[in-house]
Curated annotation (Swiss-Prot):
This is Cysteine-rich protein 2. Coiled coil: none annotated. It comes from the Eukaryota. The keyword Acetylation applies. CDD domains: LIM1_TLP. GO terms for molecular function: metal ion binding. SUPFAM superfamilies: Glucocorticoid receptor-like (DNA-binding domain). The gene is CRIP2. It comes from Pongo abelii (Sumatran orangutan). The modification Phosphoserine is found at residue 104. InterPro entries: Znf_LIM (IPR001781). Residues 98-119 are annotated as: Disordered. Interacts with TGFB1I1. Pfam families: LIM.
Length: 208
């Protein structure tokens, strides 16, 4: 039985449906609730069961205060409220508060895109070269962050893809031939890719 689109409440046929948020939608009914931009399944945010584009709409409506209020990538900050009448002359500040302000320093604005560490903490260290791995150049595999060129087979040096390789003692290996030669069952891939070597029995017959 065909399901009903949660946007227009009409029947959704197989040829025109997309599935998102656990429901079937007409392809052109899956739109941002705020700006009506057509969305792709799995490529949008959700609030109260309704779809929103990530930027700027979801960030504007439900993100941290001050982030993306003006649009994608923009930052708006509130001006501090004046407390009491303004004084033009010098003001005495208690020593304790002066030290506290000195320690905290002036408020910082948003960092550049390259310095994602402001929000995520210090970057991890690549297990291959022991240098810092920044967001734009990292791949994650074996529970660690690597530079893209540093994730290569420990034996032959071939560049690997995250999740597409074998592992031994925390080191990455290509499945064939290296892992098979070094750690596979005896006789498998000992010669080259796809080759099999068999031991002979005492009578000289080949053992399968």
């Amino acid at each position: 039985m065909a399901s009903k689109c949660p946007k227009c409440d009409k029947t959704v046929c197989f040829a025109e449906k997309v599935s998102s948020l656990g429901k079937d939608w007409h392809k052109f009914c899956l739109k941002c609730e705020r700006c009506s931009k057509t969305l792709t399944p799995g490529g949008h945010a959700e609030h109260d069961g309704k779809p929103f584009c990530h930027k700027p709409c979801y960030a504007t409506l439900f993100g941290p205060k001050g982030v993306n209020i003006g649009g994608a990538g923009s930052y708006i900050y509130e001006k501090p409220l004046a407390e009491g009448p303004q004084v033009t002359g010098p003001i005495e500040v208690p020593a304790a508060r002066a030290e506290e302000r000195k320690a905290s320093g002036p408020p910082k604005g948003p960092s550049r895109a390259s310095s994602v560490t402001t929000f995520t903490g210090e970057p991890n260290t690549c297990p291959r070269c022991s240098k810092k791995v920044y967001f734009a150049e990292k791949v994650t595999s074996l529970g660690k962050d690597w530079h893209r060129p540093c994730l290569h087979c420990e034996r032959c040096g071939k560049t690997l893809t995250p999740g597409g390789h074998a592992e031994h003692d925390g080191q990455p290996y290509c499945h064939k031939p290296c892992y098979g030669i070094l750690f596979g069952p005896k006789g498998v891939n000992t010669g080259a890719v796809g080759s099999y070597i068999y031991d002979r029995d005492p009578e000289g017959k080949v053992q399968p």
